[in-house]
Design a protein with these regions (language model features):
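Short glycine-rich, Thr/Ser-proximal phosphate-binding strand/loop in the N-terminal lobe
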Residues: 2-52, 140-168
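Anionic-ligand binding region
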Residues: 120-123, 129-151
C-alpha cells in the first residue's frame, strides 16, 4: 500500500552556503535566510585564512553544500590563476577537504549574473574594489575580465571605475566614467537587459540608461542555482556556465547527508 498523499513529505531541500569573495569583504549567506554576514577581505587574505574565518563566522549556521564566488578566472569549476586583489595560495587549495562539504566554484560576476538572468541577452557589470562583468547569451554565462582592458588612452577599466578611483577622482567624475563604460559595453554586447551590481551600485543615482540595480541579497539565488533541485541549474562548461532553465522537477533532491560526503 502506498503512503497516503496527506502523509507524504516533500524532499528536504539542501541548505546552500554562499561565499562571495570580494576585494573588500567576503559576503556570507545561507539559503532560506536573509541575513548576510561579512568578513574582511583584501591583499592579506589567503585561502586558508578565508576558510578559517568563514568557519568561525558561520559556526551557528547549518548548511549542506557550498557555492563559492571567486574574483577571477574559473574553468570547469576550478581556479585557473591567483586573484589580483587577494594574497596567494588559492590555486591548489582543496576547499572541499577544508570545509568537509561539497563545494562548487563560479566566477563572482557569473554568480550574480546567474542570480539575475531571466531570458535573452543580459549584461551584468559589478563596480566595487574591482570591476567585473558577465554576459549571459541564450542561457550561457560568459564572464568578461574587464579590469586591465584599456578604457582610455592612459587608463584601464580598473584605474577609472573602482572604489579607489571614486575616492581619488571624486564621485561626479567616477559616475561619468561609469556611464561611459556601461554605454560602451552595451554597444559591444547589445544586451536586452543590463544589471548593475557590486558594492558601489548603491551610490549610482541615477542609473545609466536601460539598466536596473542588483540587490546585495541576489547572490544567494545564484548560489542555489549551482545545485540540483533549484528552479534553474547552471553547470560549468570550460570558462562558461550553461543554464538549464527548466530542470527536471521529477528527480528528487538527494538527501543532504549523501551530498555532504566528500570523496
Amino acid at each position: 500500500m502506498g503512503i497516503p498523499m496527506a502523509n507524504r513529505r516533500a524532499p528536504i531541500p539542501m541548505k546552500v552556503l554562499m561565499i562571495d569573495i570580494g576585494g573588500s569583504n567576503v559576503k556570507l549567506m545561507v539559503s532560506g535566510d536573509t541575513e548576510m554576514r561579512k568578513i574582511p577581505s583584501g591583499r592579506e587574505l589567503t585561502a586558508r585564512k578565508m576558510v578559517s574565518e568563514v568557519k568561525a563566522a558561520t559556526a551557528d549556521w547549518d548548511f549542506d553544500v557550498i557555492s563559492l564566488g571567486f574574483p577571477g578566472l574559473v574553468k570547469d569549476g576550478r581556479l585557473v590563476r591567483e586573484p589580483l586583489n587577494l594574497s596567494g595560495g588559492w590555486l591548489r587549495f582543496d576547499f572541499q577537504r577544508a570545509f568537509a562539504r561539497p563545494v562548487r566554484i563560479i566566477n563572482d560576476a557569473a554568480l550574480h549574473a546567474l542570480a539575475n538572468y531571466e531570458k535573452g541577452r543580459m549584461l551584468f557589470v559589478g563596480f566595487g574594489t574591482s570591476v567585473g562583468a558577465a554576459l549571459v547569451a541564450d542561457s550561457v554565462i560568459i564572464p568578461v575580465e574587464l579590469g586591465l582592458i584599456p578604457f582610455s588612452r592612459r587608463n584601464t577599466f580598473m584605474s577609472r571605475l573602482t572604489k579607489e578611483a571614486r575616492r581619488q577622482n571624486g564621485h561626479k567624475r567616477w559616475q561619468r566614467d561609469v556611464f561611459a563604460a556601461v554605454l560602451l559595453l552595451q554597444d559591444i554586447f547589445w544586451p536586452d537587459d543590463t544589471v548593475i551590481g557590486g558594492g558601489n551600485a548603491k551610490v549610482l543615482d541615477p542609473l545609466p540608461a536601460r539598466c536596473r540595480r542588483a540587490s546585495n541579497l541576489d547572490g544567494i539565488k545564484g548560489a542555489v542555482r549551482l545545485w540540483e533541485g533549484a528552479d534553474r541549474l547552471a553547470k560549468p562548461h570550460g570558462t562558461t556556465w550553461r543554464i538549464n532553465m527548466h530542470p527536471s522537477r521529477s528527480k528528487p533532491t538527494p538527501p543532504p547527508h549523501a551530498l555532504a560526503q566528500v570523496a
